[in-house]
Design a protein with these regions (language model features):
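C-terminal catalytic domains of large/alpha subunits in multi-subunit enzymes
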Residues: 1-160
């Protein structure tokens, strides 16, 4: 028999979660290499229904955002095929690329969410890019406005 919907829940509003990301980096101006020393995130996703899962979601999104910001890039050859056809060419961050990662939840009760919760999925990948770009700017005096911010881009922008 076909599935039958017996009950649904929708909210008249979709309250946004909030997150701030702060990063401490070590930057070699000669090579352009950026090392993440410490990343601090403060997240307001209402009342997390499953705090352990919310933490894992946040940590994973931060690492993915760091990869997107510093190393993940897709280029194509003359025939339109991706040049990065394996993880040997397409770099993603590993635990060795990370320093300390600290996530703190700022609880707020959201009356329109289930049990006071808000969403958390997409917000976590959004803060590493601006945080890292600002840290690089503070270290070099140069704003980078395209991602990924590669070591070559940093070294070329700081060459005297």
């Amino acid at each position: 028999t076909p599935a039958e919907t017996t009950q649904t829940h929708t909210s008249p509003v979709s309250p946004p979660p909030y997150m701030v990301g702060m990063v401490e980096i070590e930057l070699d101006k000669l090579t352009g290499k950026v090392d993440i020393i410490d990343y601090m995130a403060v997240v307001d996703c209402g009342i997390p229904i499953n705090p352990a899962l919310a933490r894992i979601q946040t940590e994973g999104g931060i690492v993915q955002g760091i990869g997107h910001t510093l190393m993940e890039n897709v280029t194509y050859d003359h025939s339109g095929r991706p040049a990065e056809s394996s993880f040997m060419q397409y770099k993603v961050p590993t635990r060795l690329d990370m320093g300390r990662l600290n996530v703190v939840f700022e609880h707020s009760y959201e009356p329109t969410g289930p049990f006071g919760a808000k969403s958390i999925g997409e917000i976590v990948i959004n803060t590493p890019g601006p945080a890292i770009a600002h840290a690089i700017y503070r270290a070099t005096g140069v704003w980078h406005r395209e991602l990924p911010i590669t070591p070559e881009m940093i070294a070329m922008s700081t060459a005297e």
